[in-house]
């Protein structure tokens, strides 16, 4: 199915609408969050409802990138066929499930409702600057059912973005010291993902 992404020019008030195809492998998934990488590329968090809190095992928790530069304005379009026909292609940025599996977290321990993501402060480790991406679950404030709130933190470089054909990252926050000691390193090479560090906290 198609979702609409609405852009608003704060200065002029002009609005535009673009189509986003939330299907993965022919099946539609929930689009839980969207982040701006820059002024034309956006990251969308897509997920199933499986995992911790659902009594099942996580299957799909992924972040995709979509580029709206040159995309068709669908403000005057309606109907799934028309919207999907105008949807720009998307690129897999991070397979969260695969990354967490590589860090030793089983599918059944991955929160079902991974719904939030935000860019954090840049960090400097070994003289190299990394950008950070925070991914979090929504436990619906139901103790003992969905589990504690968890925050998974991934780091990436400008070179990682370039390798995926993505544009420059426009960060809105300042740099910070190296990651805290309890950070959990992820081995993500060859998995079509960008992170290298994950951290989990209780809310």
Report each predicted region and the residues it spans.
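Sequence/structural signature of beta-propeller domains
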Residues: 1-176
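Short, charged juxtamembrane terminal tails flanking transmembrane helices
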Residues: 201-203
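A short, hydrophobic C-terminal helix/tail in secreted or cell-surface proteins
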Residues: 179-198
